[in-house]
Amino acid sequence: MKKSLILLAALAGALSAQALDVNNLKANDNGKFWSGRAAEGYGISIGTEPKVLYNTLKVSSADGALVIDTREFFKRPDARKIVTRFYIKNNIAALKGKETSAKVQIQAEEGSGAVNLYLEGNRGTEKKHYFTAQPFAVSGCSEIVHTKQLPEDVNDIAIRLDLNKPAVYRIFNAAISAK
């Protein structure tokens, strides 16, 4: 048990962001997405499918969380999903060929949330590669984790979180760790 707790603590701290103190949060009217930076130094982008509905999102930062209100977006008949990416600076060499976990602390309010969690990145000469997704139902505060063996030729990696139902989502933490 003690060994498991030590290993869990080491994994939680490895290559991770400890809080989501978001700044420079702004809408990009040309690219039709939201962007921001976490105090920990990684980038955040929030887009919609279709892109033209990005301005229906209410995006803010409050109490150590990124807050995304998707209720107006999902009232539109052509609304499909919100794609949120966390471009976490990490030592990619430490992840190559390793079992890697994406971990997100999230809460859904004013609705029952549904999300897909991905490890997303580039490998070899491919532009985008999705290292599988895992669906989660979210209510209250949850910690969701998706683990995948990364290939040896991975070039970069990000956490992708698709928001699939109307709710007010609060994202408290996003982290990547490897065994």
Predicted features by range, described:
Residues M1-S4:
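Positively charged n-region of N-terminal signal peptides that target proteins for export
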Residues A9-A17:
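Hydrophobic h-region of N-terminal signal peptides that target proteins for export
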Residues A19-K179:
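Extracellular and organelle-lumenal recognition/adhesion modules and their flexible linkers in secreted
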